[in-house]
């Protein structure tokens, strides 16, 4: 699947800033990953290091698990390359600033893997996703996230 640079340049800084603010309000010290092509951020809280990947989704607004319109949450397969490093995968809704999170060891299971042809928003071609039942995700309402 084609990487959409314009979307990345707009949404990556926003996602990192929102997630950083959220984590800092919860007592984490947050740092950018010095590896530009690695997992986005890491945080330290109570001497525990946690890794965070963040993505911003556009066009399908949600605020809670109940109004999330699908039974599963779709996670990009290209992030599987980091599966040996346990990390939290955070998706932020652009329209509402709600967020959802799931741990990588839950996401990247073969039973959730799905291939699909995509043709939208500058993306065209076959891509692989991991579709995780939303009950395995943590949903954070906008009032608690921003």
List the predicted regions and their residue ranges:
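Short connector loops at helix/strand junctions that flank enzyme active sites
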Residues: 36-38, 49-53, 83-87
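Conserved catalytic cores of phosphodiester-cleaving nucleases, focusing on short active-site segments
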Residues: 23, 41-62
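Short beta-strand-loop-alpha-helix junction that forms the active-site gateway
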Residues: 55-77
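Acidic-basic catalytic patches of nuclease active cores, encompassing PD-(D/E)XK
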Residues: 1-35
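Short, surface-exposed beta-edge/turn micro-motifs
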Residues: 84-89, 96-98
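Short amphipathic alpha-helical segments and helix-helix/interface helices
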Residues: 20, 79-80
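Non-catalytic C-terminal interaction segments of nucleic acid-processing enzymes
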Residues: 25, 95-146
């Amino acid at each position: 699947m084609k990487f959409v640079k314009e979307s990345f340049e707009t949404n990556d800084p926003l996602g990192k800033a929102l997630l950083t603010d959220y984590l800092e309000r919860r007592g984490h010290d947050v740092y950018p990953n010095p590896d530009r092509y690695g997992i986005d951020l890491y945080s330290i809280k109570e001497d525990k290091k946690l890794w965070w990947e963040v993505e911003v989704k556009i066009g399908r607004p949600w605020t809670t698990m109940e109004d999330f319109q699908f039974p599963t949450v779709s996670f990009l397969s290209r992030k599987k390359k980091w599966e040996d490093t346990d990390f939290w995968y955070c998706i932020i809704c652009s329209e509402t600033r709600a967020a959802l999170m799931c741990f990588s060891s839950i996401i990247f299971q073969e039973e959730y893997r799905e291939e699909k042809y995509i043709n939208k928003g500058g993306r065209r071609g076959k891509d692989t996703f991991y579709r995780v039942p939303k009950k395995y995700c943590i949903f954070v309402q906008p009032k608690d996230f921003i």
